[in-house]
Structures are given as C-alpha cells and as structure tokens.
Amino acid sequence: MPVSKPSELPKGGGGRWPICGVGFRSAQWGDLEVGYTTTGPLDCTPLYAGLPGGVCQCPHYGYVFKGRLRCVYPGTEWPEEVAEAGDVYFFPAGHVLVYDEDSEVLELNPAAALVKLMDHLERLASGATPEP
C-alpha cells in the first residue's frame, strides 16, 4: 500500500508532467491522483484556455495546509468558495482556481480527470496547441 509525505511525492507526477513539476508533486494510487501543490499567488484562469468553457474539468477534494484559495464558477450562479489553512474542500468540475497567497495544498483527484488537465497544462506550457 503506498504511503508518502506530501513533500516526498514525485515531482511533476514522476516525470509525466515535467514542466509542471516546479510546484506540483503527484502519484497515481489506484483510481486517484494524490497531488501536492506549492505555489505563490496565482490566478489559474489563463491555464484553462482551450478547455470546454474555459474552466477546469477536474473535481478536487483537498486540504489546505497553508494559504488561501478561491474557487470561482464562471457562467453559473454558484457562489465563490474560499478554502483557507486548516480547511478541507470539494470543488466540482466547472471551476477556476485562484490562489490568493503562498499556499500548500494536498488534493485527491479522480486520476483520469486530472491526467487530462495536467496533459493540457503541459501542452500549454510547452507552447503546443492545446487539445480540446
């Protein structure tokens, strides 16, 4: 059975997403992707360009060790949600994430959905044309 400290998860998903490996560590355990993100302030809106609706299609279940992140649901009447240090959260697909300050976040995500998202981010970061 896999066991790891968040900071010891493989960088960039063990080489699957090398460009994203700077602040993202993850491993696939069964049908979940266990991810650990460390980032400064970041509005992820531009990262979702090319995805359906310009929003993240992956649901996220997480815990905030440090910092604060907001989840915005563009084009809906859903209210903005905020998760701060010590909070657990669930953000369904169809969102945009905004990290308001330096943050450390652990997430458990459906592996198939996260792989699609991370592959998109890698293509975007490399300058390749994102796939729909």
Region spans (language model):
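Short, conserved beta-strand element in jelly-roll/cupin
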Residues: 54-71
